């Protein structure tokens, strides 16, 4: 009997200890925000492609002044979950059926050269972007890049960018620079 009383007392002590335990105190907090846009298009744009940043690092003033271009930096526009059923077009006059996409870029052109994007930051530099077909992109918001053929699923469109002396005739100066270009897709 004494064993039963002792066992009961121990059980009560264990149960009551849990009732008097200190409440859990949060040790940090945060917030997660979810954003997106639903579009009426055959493809979505990968989130990392929709807002990109290209870092040219440090570029030689002397090299740019002598009409040089920085090392080209590659960037991609990734189209995801494409369903081109309603946009099919014969590719190259035969063979497989596929849809197409072209892009237009807009930004502040460097003077009359709409194929150079003006930089901000008094360095007298500009950005040039080359499309997948080796042609310079125009930043006029109207001139489309060459057509890229699409397949169902994911597609990647490759571009390169470089910094160079702008067309102002002013010498290249030291300092930080930046530029922003926006792109729009047109499917056919």
UniProtKB/Swiss-Prot annotation:
Keyword Disulfide bond: yes
One Pfam family recorded for the sequence: Fimbrial
Signal peptide: 1-21
UniProt keyword annotations, A-Z: Disulfide bond, Fimbrium, Signal
GO CC term, one of those recorded: pilus
Compartments where located: Fimbrium
Similarity comment: family membership: Belongs to the fimbrial protein family.
Stated role: Fimbriae (also called pili), polar filaments radiating from the surface of the bacterium to a length of 0.5-1.5 micrometers and numbering 100-300 per cell, enable bacteria to colonize the epithelium of specific host organs.
Protein name: F7-2 fimbrial protein
Species name: Escherichia coli O6:H1 (strain CFT073 / ATCC 700928 / UPEC)
Gene that specifies this protein: F7-2
